[in-house]
Amino acid sequence: MKETVTAPTDGFHQEESTLEVEKKKSQPFELEDSEYHLKACKVSTPEVQTTPVIFTSPHSGRNYFPQFLASSRLNKLDLRRSEDAFIDEVFKRVPENGAPLLCAKFPRAYVDVNREAFELDPTMFHDPLPNFVKTTSPRITAGLGTIAKIVTDGEEIYHAKISVKEALWR
């Protein structure tokens, strides 16, 4: 069985690309990140869906890009404090019980998918943010925008400011 997946081709989401992926019953399929060759998410579907509920694990990803680790003041163990560690493992049998499961494979410290797409702290970037970016919110003030400034216990993540291009790519 084939499934069509539509995904943005750039950080601005102005153009979309349609991919056809081969999907086998009861087997997870993954969308691949073309630049880093790291699979960004994993979708596991039940053989027969028996519920309208979709389970998600957006914050338990453990795949850390080498470039991200190099830009961080913190080691991997310190960065992992922001994860909802192993929730993907807790939910792994959900598809056997009739519901789909969507798991992010990247960490919340890299990008938090439970934020607005462009909820960014302007003090984190060495160049100006585009006008469409939301730059004020309680989460941004707390250092927990779409791209977090801090880990859970308040330690800053980055050595230096990052580029807007990097933020939009994420």
Predicted regions and their residues:
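N-terminal catalytic or cofactor-binding beta/alpha core of small enzyme domains
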Residues: 2-170
